Amino acid sequence: MSTEYNYEISYGKMCIPLYRVYAAPLTGVAPIPESAFTGRENTLLAAEVDVEVSGGNFIAAYTHGDNRNIVATDSMKNFVLKHALTFEGSTLEEFLHLLGHAFLATYAQIERVRLTGRELAFTAASVPQRGVFGAS
């Protein structure tokens, strides 16, 4: 009796640092009772992004040493950074949405992609400006 197995491989690149200077301002956010947040200037949009790709197309790399379908993890990092440079949106969620579509459109061998992002808070520091302290 033979048993057929279905395998799926997943791998990726974690903690890709992303810094987008002067991203589009986030404005017009309706406040909710729990928060007074209505937007931010986005002088610096900073985050860490994790990429995990999966699918059956990567099996040959593990069973036959055939890496033709593998997307190198450094290529994943470079792909994230390249798309951050041209990102015109205001939120990390929007960036991850666009990035996920771009991964799937660019690399046909990827069946699924999981993206996780952690936004890093940026608070402007006070710096001397014409004899007084102002926001950096």
What spans do the regions from the language model cover?
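N-terminal intrinsically disordered, cationic/polar leader segments
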Residues: 1-136
